[in-house]
Amino acid sequence: MKKNLTFFMVIALLFTITPNVYAMHIAEGFLPPMWSGVYFVISAPFIIIGLKQIRERAKDNKDIKMLLGLVAAYAFILSAMKIPSVTGSCSHPTGTGLSAIIFGPFISAIVGLIVLIFQAILLAHGGITTLGANTLSMGIMGPIVSYLIYRGFKNKNQKVAVFLAATLGDLFTYFITSVQLALAFPAQQGGIAASFAKFFSIFSITQIPLAIMEGILTVIIFEFVMKYASKEIEVLGGVRK
């Protein structure tokens, strides 16, 4: 299992070497300080619970950390593929649907946070001041939707459940990002509602096809994980065929 996951992660790192330097989600300094602080506070409890869950589950099987690294690498790859969209932001897959399906929403918050920190520091995508806002949308709210959808549909058709979870979780991430931007920058005419409609409609043009592609790719990667990390999946107890 370790050899297979190590190979996958090496390939993943090769794909992350990219000349593109677009802002990831909401760019550094783009949000007013008050809103940046609010999103840090909201995200904090999820991060704390996620850290506790990782420690507890790693006691049963140390290879779970390797699996966690795999899903983090997957999220890093997808979220590095960017298409410029709204001023101060961009569209891209999120990749956190896979971690939500395998680990649940709280550990996915850690995955999202790690990916966002590395991209902010190494690739100048996103930023530190907007880390709370971006973690809330990509690492928390999107994965919550992915997790709930997967749990609701997995007993009917697992592949369909994975596809819907990844696709709709991606779209909900941008729904939340649009809300965040609308709250920070309400339109002079129409206020928050008009601002949200503008942001989300522009996001949707590029995000809907990206979300569908992410859903398809997540099904493929999920099958790979189920094949080569079945023991770790059993320890987690969240994924059942």
Curated annotation (Swiss-Prot):
It comes from Clostridium tetani (strain Massachusetts / E88). The lineage of its organism: Bacteria, Bacillati, Bacillota, Clostridia, Eubacteriales. Its main location: membrane. Pfam families: CbiM (PF01891). The gene is cbiM. GO terms for molecular function: cobalt ion transmembrane transporter activity. The chain crosses the membrane at residues 29-49, 66-86, 98-118, 121-141, 160-180, 202-222. It is a multi-pass membrane protein. Forms an energy-coupling factor (ECF) transporter complex composed of an ATP-binding protein (A component, CbiO), a transmembrane protein (T component, CbiQ) and 2 possible substrate-capture proteins (S components, CbiM and CbiN) of unknown stoichimetry. The keyword Cytoplasm does not apply. Pathway: Cofactor biosynthesis; adenosylcobalamin biosynthesis. This is Cobalt transport protein CbiM.
